[in-house]
C-alpha cells in the first residue's frame, strides 16, 4: 500500500472522529463521511468496506496508546500515587491534544451495542480500569492512600470524573484546558485520600 493510501485512510478516520464529536455516533454515515472528505461514497469504499469498518478503526485509534502509556508508567521509579497521577495526566494530555477523540468516552454504551466494536471497546474499558485498580491497590498496600474505599471504586470514580469533565466541556465554555482542569480536580481528590506520614 502506498503512503497516499495510508494517509488518506488516516484522514478518513480523523474525519469520522470529528463527525462523532460534532454530531454524535448516529451522524457517522458513508454519505456524511464522503461529504466531509470531499469524495464520492464509491471512492470511500475503496478504503473501507462500510461504516462498521470505519468505526473499528476509530476505536483502534482511541486505544492505540494504551499499552505504551501503561508500560511507561510501570517503568517509572516513583511512588504509586505519582504513577496514578502520571497515568491520568497522560490521558489528559492526549485528550487535550486530540479533543475530538475524547468524546468517544461518551459513546461507550453505543459502541458496546455495535457487534463490530463491542469486543474492542469492552477490552479497552476493562484494561484501563484494571490498570487503574492495580495502581490504587498498590498505593493502598504501600500506605500512601487510605483503604477506606476499594481500588475498584476509586478507579471508577476517577474515570467518571474524566467523563464528567468531557461532558461538561461540551456544554459550557472553559478558560482552562481539559488537562489543567481535570488534573487540578484529581490532585484535590487525591489529597483527600493521601495518608500523611
Language-model features and meaning:
Residues 1-7, 197:
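N-terminal intrinsically disordered/low-complexity leader segments
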Residues 8-17, 33, 58-62, 66, ...:
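Generic hydrophobic, amphipathic alpha-helix propensity
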Residues 11, 19-53, 57:
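Helix-turn-helix
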Residues 96-116:
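Amphipathic alpha-helical segments used for helix-helix packing
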Residues 57, 71-97, 151-158:
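Hydrophobic alpha-helical connector segments
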Residues 67, 71-74, 97, 115-142, ...:
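Amphipathic alpha-helical packing segments from all-alpha helical-bundle domains
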Residues 9, 55, 59, 63, ...:
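Amphipathic, non-transmembrane alpha-helical scaffold segments
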Residues 103-104, 140-187:
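Hydrophobic/aromatic-rich alpha-helical bundle segments in the mid-to-C-terminal region
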Amino acid at each position: 500500500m502506498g503512503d497516499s493510501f495510508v494517509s488518506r485512510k488516516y484522514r478518513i478516520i480523523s474525519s469520522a472522529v470529528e463527525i462523532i464529536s460534532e454530531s454524535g455516533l448516529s451522524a457517522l454515515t458513508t454519505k456524511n463521511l464522503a461529504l466531509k472528505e470531499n469524495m464520492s461514497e464509491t471512492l470511500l469504499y475503496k478504503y473501507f468496506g462500510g461504516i462498521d469498518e470505519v468505526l473499528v478503526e476509530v476505536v483502534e485509534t482511541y486505544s492505540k496508546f494504551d499499552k505504551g502509556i501503561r508500560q511507561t508508567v510501570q517503568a517509572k521509579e516513583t511512588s504509586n500515587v505519582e504513577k496514578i497521577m502520571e497515568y491520568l495526566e497522560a490521558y489528559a494530555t492526549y485528550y487535550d491534544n486530540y479533543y475530538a477523540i475524547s468524546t468517544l468516552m461518551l459513546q461507550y454504551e453505543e459502541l458496546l451495542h455495535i457487534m463490530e466494536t463491542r469486543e474492542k471497546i469492552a477490552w479497552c474499558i476493562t484494561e484501563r480500569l484494571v490498570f487503574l485498580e492495580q495502581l490504587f491497590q498498590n498505593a493502598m498496600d504501600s500506605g500512601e492512600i487510605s483503604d477506606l474505599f476499594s481500588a475498584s471504586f476509586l478507579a471508577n470514580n476517577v474515570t467518571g470524573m474524566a467523563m464528567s469533565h468531557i461532558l461538561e466541556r461540551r456544554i459550557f465554555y472553559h478558560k482552562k484546558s481539559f488537562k489543567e482542569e481535570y488534573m487540578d480536580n484529581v490532585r484535590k481528590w487525591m489529597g483527600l485520600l493521601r495518608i500523611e506520614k
